[in-house]
Amino acid sequence: MSRRCELTAKGVQTGHKVSHSNIKTKRRFLPNLVNVTFLSDALGRPVRLRVSTNALKSVDHRGGLDAFLLKASVAELSPKAAELKRAIAKKKAAEPAAAAS
């Protein structure tokens, strides 16, 4: 399992730990990742993703997982999240057609 957010593609960064005497030592900055189960309104089922806490705020701000995925670009999403986006878009496109009939 990689240390990368499935929604925002936030990953590991590298840098230096700097001592008082300005000696630099390589270190890694790990993203704050959590395993979360989101409820998809369009799909009507729970979806389990590994996301950063920053992505949790973004999903909440945009009004849920469905709205976040529909606005996000496919380039920054994981393959699993991109597949979810396609499924949600397909369901949303089928809803108005079913209501019109």
Swiss-Prot record:
Protein name as it appears in the record: Large ribosomal subunit protein bL28
Organism: Rhodopseudomonas palustris (strain HaA2)
Homology family: Belongs to the bacterial ribosomal protein bL28 family.
One term under GO cellular component: cytosolic large ribosomal subunit
Record-linked InterPro entries: Ribosomal_bL28 (IPR026569), Ribosomal_bL28/bL31-like_sf (IPR034704), Ribosomal_bL28_bact-type (IPR001383), Ribosomal_bL28_sf (IPR037147)
HAMAP family in UniProt: Ribosomal_bL28
GO MF term set: structural constituent of ribosome
Keywords: Ribonucleoprotein, Ribosomal protein
The keyword Transport is annotated on this UniProt entry: no
Single GO BP term: translation
